[in-house]
């Protein structure tokens, strides 16, 4: 009987030592989940500021390959605070010319290897209008689905507000 118990313990330990590296690699390279805090992406994410925070599925694989399109919602390392990750919408890609918000008649050409990101809730978002174009190297992942709360479960499709379309696309 004791030998039978040891076999289960040994199987559990060996399974544990296989499962942990596989899980860590998956979360580091493929996908993970994150809770969205704040109001900067309202109404797309966290539409009710007093309610539950949205929990989103983040696809890390696409970000690693710099597979970015206008309208994608992405998670990125904050250019102002490397300890913080922020979530924003891609408005423009390299070579695009964008009219900035909050600056009269100011136009910016997005440099090579960069994107222009903004929150959906203008005036309540710390985004490219404050810190400029963002290096593709700061992208962490793409938000692909809202997982929680259950009544908000949905796929996040790329969407670009008409008023935020680029002035010129290369």
UniProtKB/Swiss-Prot annotation:
Record localization: Mitochondrion inner membrane
One Pfam family named in its UniProt record: Peptidase_S26
Gene Ontology CC annotations of this record: mitochondrial inner membrane peptidase complex
Residues annotated as catalytic: 40, 88
Residues in coiled coil: none
Entries under InterPro entries matching the protein: IMP2, LexA/Signal_pep-like_sf, Pept_S26A_signal_pept_1, Pept_S26A_signal_pept_1_CS, Peptidase_S26
TM regions (residue ranges): 12-31
Keyword Transmembrane helix: yes
Any single biological process term in GO: protein processing involved in protein targeting to mitochondrion
Oligomer status and interactors: Heterodimer of 2 subunits, IMMPL1 and IMMPL2.
Name the record gives this protein: Mitochondrial inner membrane protease subunit 2
Biological source species: Xenopus laevis (African clawed frog)
Lineage: Eukaryota, Metazoa, Chordata, Craniata, Vertebrata
């Amino acid at each position: 009987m004791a030998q039978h118990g040891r076999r289960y313990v040994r199987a559990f330990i060996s399974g544990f030592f296989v499962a942990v590296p596989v899980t860590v690699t998956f979360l580091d390279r493929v996908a993970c989940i994150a809770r969205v805090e704040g109001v900067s992406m309202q109404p797309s994410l966290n539409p009710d500021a007093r309610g539950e925070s949205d929990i989103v599925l983040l696809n890390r694989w696409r970000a690693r390959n710099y597979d970015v399109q206008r309208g994608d919602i992405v998670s990125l390392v904050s250019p102002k605070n490397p300890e913080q990750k922020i979530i924003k919408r891609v408005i423009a890609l390299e070579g695009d010319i964008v009219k900035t918000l909050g600056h009269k008649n100011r136009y910016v050409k997005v440099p090579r290897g960069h994107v222009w990101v903004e929150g959906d809730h203008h005036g309540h978002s710390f985004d490219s209008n404050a810190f400029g174009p963002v290096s593709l190297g700061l992208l962490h992942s793409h938000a692909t689905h809202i997982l929680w709360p259950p009544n908000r479960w949905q796929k996040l499709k790329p969407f670009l507000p008409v008023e935020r379309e680029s002035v010129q696309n290369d």
